[in-house]
Amino acid sequence: MADTFLLKIVTPDKDIFNGNIKRIFLKNSVGRLEILANHANMVTSTISSIVEFTDADGKDRKLFISKGIASIFNNEMTIFSESAEFSDNIDLNRAEKAKERAEKRLLEGNKYDKERAELALLRSIERINLKKMN
């Protein structure tokens, strides 16, 4: 049995990552998942969070993904996400301003705005956390 599997991370705009990895940690609405090579086939939703994986060379990598879908089939995993960014591509000032806007909308908004603001707040916090890790 192989100890690696193929990971593809895809957004509507571009492919973010395409390569073999040893393991990945990601989050769905239930909690944190660890996926290793030869995992059973499955499909799950993902939430905005920091994804951690170890590439085939043993290097640990982290990136932010927004909500999406993760599919595992025949030792290949594809994550389809609205957006995904490695730390190098995150603008910390922009993320902090997005956080401030979301917090303000939470205080002012109606129920619909509140739900959107909560999601925007989660995205901005996860981006900030990732940027500050590196």
UniProtKB/Swiss-Prot annotation:
One of its GO terms (cellular component) is plasma membrane. It is found in: Cell membrane. Pfam families: ATP-synt_DE, ATP-synt_DE_N. It is a peripheral membrane protein. One of its GO terms (molecular function) is ATP binding. Keywords: ATP synthesis, Cell membrane, CF(1), Hydrogen ion transport, Ion transport, Membrane, Transport. Its main location: membrane. InterPro entries: ATP_F1_dsu/esu_C_sf, ATP_synth_F1_dsu/esu, ATP_synth_F1_dsu/esu_N, ATP_synth_F1_esu_C, ATPsynth_dsu/esu_N. HAMAP family: ATP_synth_epsil_bac. NCBIfam families: ATP_synt_epsi. Produces ATP from ADP in the presence of a proton gradient across the membrane. F-type ATPases have 2 components, CF(1) - the catalytic core - and CF(0) - the membrane proton channel. CF(1) has five subunits: alpha(3), beta(3), gamma(1), delta(1), epsilon(1). CF(0) has three main subunits: a, b and c. Belongs to the ATPase epsilon chain family. This is ATP synthase epsilon chain.
